[in-house]
Regions:
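Conserved alpha/beta-domain cores
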Residues: 1-167
């Protein structure tokens, strides 16, 4: 029911208000089957990918998203990589546990996390699809932001207070 309301609101924004530059970003798509179901439900509610320029972007924030990136991209127009969740779920830790516990090991620059992110970027670039990143990592680590640019990321979301530090 809530999803139907969200779709109705998006339809109104795009059709009635003419804001066709507004796109849909779908979070936490766990499986290919779930991607199919979400796309199908949206279509039944009047939001069809490609219709009136509608782009569907998937949050790539679960290791399975990176592992099966090529298959997920069959259903979406690109990824926004959620580096916080990708790091937590790849390393099996919680960044909010307190620095004295597990959070001290929370680092987007860990080789396993970089592998997942690079795999996701490469899949998007190979298919000529959008790829951006959101999360704390590029704001906290200028070297990570530079690495992302070298890998071909399309956009990087930064916290406003860190723009000067990463300049």
């Amino acid at each position: 029911e809530a999803f139907a309301l969200e779709c109705a609101a998006m339809k109104r924004v795009r059709e009635d208000m003419g804001l066709t530059n507004v796109e849909i970003m779908v979070p936490f798509v766990r499986t290919i089957k779930q991607a199919e179901r979400v796309i199908d439900m949206m279509a039944k509610l009047g939001l069809k990918r490609g219709e009136n320029g509608l782009r569907l972007i998937m949050m790539c924030e679960i290791p399975s998203n990176a592992i099966l990136a090529d298959q997920f991209l069959e259903y979406f127009d690109g990824f926004s990589i959620g580096s916080n969740d990708m790091t937590q779920l790849t390393l099996g830790l919680d960044r909010d546990s307190g620095m004295e516990l597990l959070a001290i090991d929370f680092d987007e620059r860990d080789p396993a996390v970089l592998f997942m992110i690079e795999r996701s970027i490469d899949a998007c670039l190979k298919q000529n699809k959008y790829v951006g990143i959101c999360g704390q990592g590029p704001s906290d680590h200028p070297d990570f932001a530079r690495w992302l640019v070298k890998k071909g990321i399309t956009s990087i979301s930064l916290n406003p207070d860190s723009v000067v530090a990463t300049w």
